[in-house]
Regions:
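SDR active-site strand-loop-helix element
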Residues: 5, 25, 50-54, 87-92
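Structural signature of beta-strand start/N-cap positions in the alpha/beta core
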Residues: 1, 21, 46-48, 86
């Protein structure tokens, strides 16, 4: 079974519209920052693939709200990954510093310049 997180966001909504058999969640139906809740949800729904579109996306606000940004962008993906389900994690170009050659490729060195970019990079690693 496929799980799409972040279904209230633009990308999550679009994927939910295309992948109509998927289970779609938002922050109200699944708190990805709560490891126990995530594990139970994945187990109870026989999830074997997760597309993680959930994110703290207030780029500028992340500077002053870094704990919440870290909770959502780092701890959330870590909790999802630790379920054992395969995961597709959506990230951002903010993991790069903007000085590289376009297009960015997965093997390029990252160098986030903001709290938002740093948390998204840590989420990739998680």
């Amino acid at each position: 079974m496929l799980l799409i997180t972040g279904c209230n966001g633009q990308l999550g909504r679009c994927l939910a519209d295309l992948l109509t058999d998927a289970i779609c969640t938002d922050v109200k139906t699944l708190d990805i920052t709560n490891a126990d809740e995530v594990n139970k949800f994945v187990k109870d729904n026989n999830i074997d693939l997760i597309i993680n579109c959930a994110a703290y996306t207030a780029v500028d606000m992340a500077q002053s709200d870094s704990l919440n940004a870290k909770k959502i962008n780092v701890d959330g993906p870590k909790n999802l990954a630790q379920t054992g389900a395969k995961i597709i994690h959506i990230s951002t170009d903010y993991v790069f510093d903007g000085y590289g050659h376009l297009p960015y490729t997965p093997d390029m060195q990252t160098n986030p310049l903001s709290v938002y970019g740093q948390t998204k990079r840590e989420g990739e690693i998680a």
